[in-house]
UniProtKB/Swiss-Prot annotation:
An example Gene Ontology molecular-function term: 3-deoxy-manno-octulosonate cytidylyltransferase activity
Pathway the protein takes part in: Nucleotide-sugar biosynthesis; CMP-3-deoxy-D-manno-octulosonate biosynthesis; CMP-3-deoxy-D-manno-octulosonate from 3-deoxy-D-manno-octulosonate and CTP: step 1/1; Bacterial outer membrane biogenesis; lipopolysaccharide biosynthesis
Pfam families: CTP_transf_3 (PF02348)
Membership in a protein family: Belongs to the KdsB family.
GO biological process: CMP-keto-3-deoxy-D-manno-octulosonic acid biosynthetic process; lipopolysaccharide biosynthetic process
SUPFAM superfamilies associated with the record: Nucleotide-diphospho-sugar transferases
Gene name of this polypeptide: kdsB
EC code: 2.7.7.38
Protein name: 3-deoxy-manno-octulosonate cytidylyltransferase
Main function: Activates KDO (a required 8-carbon sugar) for incorporation into bacterial lipopolysaccharide in Gram-negative bacteria.
GO cellular component: cytosol
Amino acid sequence: MKCMIVIPARLASSRLSQKLLLQAGGKSVLQHTYEAALKSSVAEEVIVAVDDPRLAAEVDSFGGQARLTSVDCQSGTDRIAEVALMHEDINILINVQGDEPEIDPKTIDAVAKLLMQHPEADIATAACAIKDRERVEDPNCVKAVLGDDHRAITFSRAAVPHPRDGLTDALLNAEPPNYWQHIGLYAYRREFLLWFATQPPGRLEQIEKLEQLRAIEAGKTIVVAPVEASAPGIDTLEDFRAFTARIESQ
């Protein structure tokens, strides 16, 4: 199977202006993400799907491949679907967010390989165990509920599964884990992705603001790769400063 990593990159950002172009350690955030993606052992190609010529110029400056996509794309998934239309020979497309410069290539590989191992699945993604009460209860920490054989039952911002009798230490520390933090990295089968991009947002998706629920509502199969930890993304100036400090300390 042929795999391609696509990094959807949008210039505008509500909380941190043009964050993908910010420099840390002599490289842009976008270049750091691109170079991390290149370390994947499963992808034959890495492409950045951009919405602005300035991002395309940045990708060109560090020798990467950029594809200019429509400004009308409503999400990164839509940008990846546009790239999928250009590459009929690709079987699996992997979505790596442009603002995750510390993404672990092993996580990328684990997600792609899991999709290959499950021909019945449409999407693969990742999650790490949660042992911290605050994260379980934090709506900004998206939880994945897992069934047998890596299947995702649902995703939610709520504390799910909900502990009727209270969240005890026994529930938090159980093995296998009861609580999983979803990691927003996806591998899609090309035919599924092209279908998905034509579908309107689902009812649950609109309530939770979680795009993956569109697939769950439609009865599609999502498999989840368990990984050790999630990579910190860059959403705020504080996130960027922390990333810069880590880069400069290396």
